[in-house]
Amino acid sequence: MSSSESSSASGGGPPDAEPSQTEQQTMPQLDTLISHLVAAKRSLSSINHVWRANEIVTTARAALEESVVVSARTGFLRRGLNNQLRLLYSVRTEVEEISLRGRSEFAAVLKDLDAADARLRRTLELLRETIVHGGFRPEGEQPRSLHDFVDERGVEELHAALKNSIDRTNGAQAQLDSSNHAFDDELLSIKEALGNYRAVAKLASSRSSSSPSSSSASNSSLPSMSSMPSMLHSLEMHAQEMANLLESLVRHFDLCVTAVKHTEGGGAAAKSITGDMHVGVNASGRIGPNIEEGINANLNAPLDPLSDSEYREMVHVLIKDATEAEDVVMEIHDRIGEMESSLENVLAQRDALRSIYNATIDVFQHLSSLASTRLPGYIAQAHDFTRVWHEENDRIAGGLDDLAHLNSFYDGFLDAYDGLIIEVARRRHVRQRVEKVLRDAKHKLDQLYEEDVNAREAFRVEKGDYLPSDIWPEVGREPMRIEFRRILGGKVKGAVSEQANDEEPTAGEREQRGGGQENHLSAVGDNTEVDEVIPELPRDLVEQVFARIQTRVKSTT
C-alpha cells in the first residue's frame, strides 16, 4: 500500500490525452468506490488496536521498571536473609549445645551423687544393724546399735543443701527447655514462611519456564529478568509497526474519500459515509502521528482538481490497495494478539516477582521480629542456665566431698568398733596371761615361805636355847610375806590431752573404777576386782570381726 503515497501526492498537472473508450469502460462505478470507502472506513477501527498497543507498551514499561526495582530489593533481602538465617541457626545450635552439655554434666553429677549417697546409706544401715555388745554398756541398759551414737543432723542438712542445688538446677534446665521450645516454634514459623517462599518461587519459576520467551528461567528460583527488556523492545517494535500500518490504512481511506468525491455524484455519498466519524482518543505519542487530526483534515479539505489520467491512476492505486487492506487489518490484529500475549507474560513475571518479594518480606519480618524482641531473651536464658549450673555444680561438688567424708567417717566408726572388739579380746588375753604369771609366782612364793618358816623353826629348836635373846632381836621373827598390789591404769598417753577438758569423775565413778589411782588387793587369790573391767566377748563374735576385717582389707587391695 505504499504506492498510494506517490499517487495521492500529485495535486494536479497538465491534462493528459483523452481516455480511450476501453479505459472508460474499465473504470469502476461509483458503487464500487463507495464499497471500497466503506471497507476503508471499517478498517480504521483498527485504531483501537493501535491505542491498545500504546497502552500495552506503557504498561509493559511500567511493569519492567517495577520488576527491576522489586528484583533488586528481593535480591538484597535474600542475601541479608541468608546471612541472618545462618547466624540464627548457629545461635540455636549453640543454645542447644549448652542445654545438652549442661544436661549431660548434670546427669553425670547426679549419678556420682546417687552413688555417694547410696554408699553413705549402706554405711548408715550397717551402723543400724551393728548392735553394741552388752559388755560395753551399763547393766540393764536397752540394746543399742552403733547408729544410736551417730548424729544424723549433718547428713540431713547436707541432703537438704544438695536438694536445693538439684531443684535450682532442674528449674534452670526447665526454663531453658521452655525457652528452647519457644525458639523452635519461632524457627518452625520461619520454616513455614520459607516454605511459602519456596512454593511461590517454584510456581513463579514454572510459570516463567512455560513462556517461550523465558525458557532460560526454568532452573532459577526467580523469573528471568533478562528476557523482559527484549519483550519490551519487541512490544515497542510491534506498536510502531502497527502505527505505520494504521497510517497506510488512513492514507487508503483518504484516497477512497478523494476518489469518491471526484466521482460524479460521489460528494454527497462521501459526506454521508464519513459524517458520523468521531475519533475521540488522541493516539499521538512515540508510536505515530496524531491520526485524529489527519483524518479530520482530509475529510474537510477542499478538492484539488485532477486530470483524467491522475484520476485513473488514483483509482488504480485505490483498487490495488483495497485488496491489501484486509491483510493489513489482519496483520494489526495478529500483532495486537501477540502483544497481549507478551504483556501477559510480562505481567505474570512482574506478579511472580511481587509474590516472591512479598514472601521474602514475610520471612524478613519474622526474622526481624525475632531478632529484635525474643532472640535476646533466648540467648539470655542460656546464659542464665550456664551461670546457675556453674554455681550449683560447685556446691554439688562440695556436697559430694562432704558425703564422701561422712561415709569415710562412718566407715571408720565401723572399723573402729571392730577394732575395739579385737582390742578387748587382746586385752582379755593379756589379762589371762598376767593372771597366770601371778598364780605361778604366788605358788612359788608360798613354797619358799613354807620352806623358810620350817627352816627357821628348826633353827630355833636346835640352837635357840643356846643363844641369848638380845644377841639379834630378829632371830625369832617369821619370814616376810609378799602381797601383790593392783594399780588402776591411767589414761593412755595420746588420750590424756584429749580428755584434759573433760569433767572430773564423780565419787561413784571413782568407786566403780576402784576408788582411786591405786588399789590394794588383800591377796593374790582374791576374786574381788575393782580395777578396769574387760568385757568377756563370745568367741564367735571375735571370729566374725576378724572375718570382716580380712574382707575389708581384701577389698581395698
Swiss-Prot record:
GO cellular component, one term: phagophore assembly site membrane
Disulfide bonds: none
UniProt topology in membrane: Peripheral membrane protein
Comp. bias intervals (Low complexity): 205-227
Stretches the record annotates as Disordered: 1-25, 204-227, 495-532
Name used for this protein in its record: Autophagy-related protein 17
GO molecular function: molecular adaptor activity; protein kinase activator activity
Residue ranges of the TM segments: none
Gene source species: Aspergillus clavatus (strain ATCC 1007 / CBS 513.65 / DSM 816 / NCTC 3887 / NRRL 1 / QM 1276 / 107)
Example GO biological process: autophagosome assembly
PANTHER family linked to this entry: AUTOPHAGY-RELATED PROTEIN 17
Pfam families associated with the record: ATG17_like (PF04108)
Cellular compartments annotated: Cytoplasm; Preautophagosomal structure membrane
Similarity section: Belongs to the ATG17 family.
Coiled-coil regions listed: 334-355, 428-458
